[in-house]
Regions:
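Cap/lid segment of the alpha/beta-hydrolase catalytic domain
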Residues: 1-59, 66-67, 73, 108-117
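Loop/turn elements at helix/coil->beta-strand transitions in domains of secreted/extracellular proteins
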Residues: 4-7, 72-75, 96-100, 144-148, ...
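Flexible loop/turn segments at secondary-structure boundaries
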Residues: 16-20, 85-88, 108-113, 140, ...
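Mobile cap/lid helix-loop segments that gate and shape the active-site cleft of serine hydrolases
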Residues: 37-45, 53, 57-60, 99-141, ...
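Alpha/beta-hydrolase fold nucleophile elbow
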Residues: 70-82
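Glycine-rich nucleophile elbow surrounding the catalytic serine of serine-hydrolase chemistry
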Residues: 80-92
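Alpha/beta-hydrolase-fold serine-hydrolase catalytic core, especially in secreted/extracellular enzymes
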Residues: 144, 151-206
């Protein structure tokens, strides 16, 4: 994105990159998922959630980004892969300052996650979600008809069948709002990751 001329802010959310928390535990090395779940359990004991902390990181990052004079505040997109896709999904629902979003390798359905026995990181399912009858798509519907591209991979553990199902459900709402052209789906032909094919789909939206 930066090479294409965009102003870009890439944050290290808590428990990733330079913000790893458990440096004295070699068994956590190489996998941020361990950290997410250990810290997530600690936060639950205090009435907090890992997802809320990570979302707040993104919100405060957005505060800073929009304070920069070179940033066009009328065109602000959010994207990320895996944990970044999770963050994009939830922050997109929360933030009215965003104008487009591209979650990658997170969107599927809760049912597919259960059927595939997919272990989830602490932040991936906000407490009360299932009790409220919410699906992943509901977090995308919350900001319809904001321009959106849903990205997945054919060999991802976030089941691409669920990705397609969610996309179709969300697209119905966009259609009702007269904005079907504002939502897109790209399923790449690879494993869990932000492939060139998917990045190109995101560039075309942004």
């Amino acid at each position: 994105l930066a090479m294409k001329g965009y102003a870009v802010l890439a944050i290290d959310p808590v428990s990733q990159g330079e913000r790893l928390q458990f440096l004295d535990f070699p068994e956590f090395k190489g996998s941020c998922c361990w950290e997410h779940n250990v810290m997530g359990k600690q936060l639950l004991l205090t009435g907090e959630t890992m997802g809320a902390w990570r979302a707040w990181d993104a919100v405060r990052g957005l505060d800073y980004l929009l304070s920069r004079p070179e940033v066009d505040t009328t065109r602000v997109g959010l994207t990320g892969n895996s944990g970044g896709g999770t963050m994009t999904t939830f922050v997109n629902a929360l933030e009215d300052r965003l104008t487009m979003a591209a979650p990658s390798c997170y969107i599927t359905t809760w049912v597919h996650n259960v059927e595939n026995e997919l272990p989830a990181d602490s932040e991936q399912m906000p407490p009360g979600t299932l009790a409220a009858g919410l699906e992943m798509g509901d977090f995308l519907i919350a900001r319809a008809p904001r321009p959106l591209v849903v990205l997945g991979q054919s060999n991802d553990f976030f089941d691409p069948r669920g990705t397609r199902e969610t996309y179709e459900e969300v697209r119905k709402v966009y259609r009702l709002l007269g904005a079907e052209d504002s939502i897109r789906l790209t399923i790449g032909h690879g494993d869990h990751g932000y492939s060139k094919e998917n990045r190109e789909a995101m560039y075309s939206l942004f």
